[in-house]
């Protein structure tokens, strides 16, 4: 990706010296130019290439442009998971966006939109003693003989009961069995 940043430093009208017709730069402008050149020499960008150009005096102002290009180092990592699950209480299928940090190092509790029940998805801080040391939904369901399917391309966790995966029509809730499948 190439980017170009340009800064235009305007100064008041250049004064013409009385003798030889030479342009003179006021003291404040010399300090600004010196500061710009100092910043150019001290600036270093580790992940980009930098080229600085100081324009010539055109009588309108001093132009200062920086051109740099940055290239992605590796891939950007998503910071969230999309949790897709079916509530066992009311059979509502829903999707929630949860933080990866909370899932792996904190506590995640989601609320079912159908029955308003709270479901523990992850407990890495050991807040809930009834989980018997299990830290996340994958470990909780593995102890019950169920599985969690990870879909890496879309950063999603899908909770699927093994029986419903083998017999999808038998486990379908009554409000979805009439052919009006929600997606």
UniProtKB/Swiss-Prot annotation:
| Protein's name in the database | DNL-type zinc finger protein
A biological process from GO: protein stabilization
Annotated region described as Disordered, given as residue ranges: 160-183
In terms of Pfam families, this protein maps to: zf-DNL
Arranged from A to Z, the UniProt key words for this protein are: Chaperone, Metal-binding, Mitochondrion, Transit peptide, Zinc, Zinc-finger
Give the transit peptide, as a residue range.
1-62
GO-annotated molecular function: protein-folding chaperone binding; zinc ion binding
Origin organism lineage: Eukaryota, Metazoa, Chordata, Craniata, Vertebrata
Q: Subcellular localization, per the record?
A: Mitochondrion
Question: Which segments does the record annotate as DNL-type zinc fingers?
Answer: 76-173
């Amino acid at each position: 990706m190439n980017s170009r940043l340009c800064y235009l430093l305007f100064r008041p009208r250049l004064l013409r010296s009385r003798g030889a017709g030479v342009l003179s730069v006021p003291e404040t402008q010399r300090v600004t130019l010196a500061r710009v050149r100092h910043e150019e020499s001290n600036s270093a960008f580790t992940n980009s290439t930098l080229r600085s150009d100081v324009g010539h005096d055109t009588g309108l102002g001093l132009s200062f442009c920086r051109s740099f290009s940055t290239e992605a180092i590796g891939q950007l990592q998503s910071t969230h998971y999309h949790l897709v699950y079916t509530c066992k209480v009311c059979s509502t299928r829903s999707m929630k966006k949860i933080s990866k940090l909370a899932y792996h190092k904190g506590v995640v509790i989601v609320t079912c939109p159908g029955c308003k029940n709270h479901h523990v998805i992850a407990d890495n801080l050991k807040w809930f003693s009834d989980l018997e040391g299990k830290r996340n939904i994958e470990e909780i369901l593995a102890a019950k003989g169920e599985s969690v399917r990870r879909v890496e391309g879309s950063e999603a966790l899908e909770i699927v009961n093994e029986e419903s995966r083998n017999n999808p029509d038998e486990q379908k809730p009554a409000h979805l069995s009439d052919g009006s499948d929600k997606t």
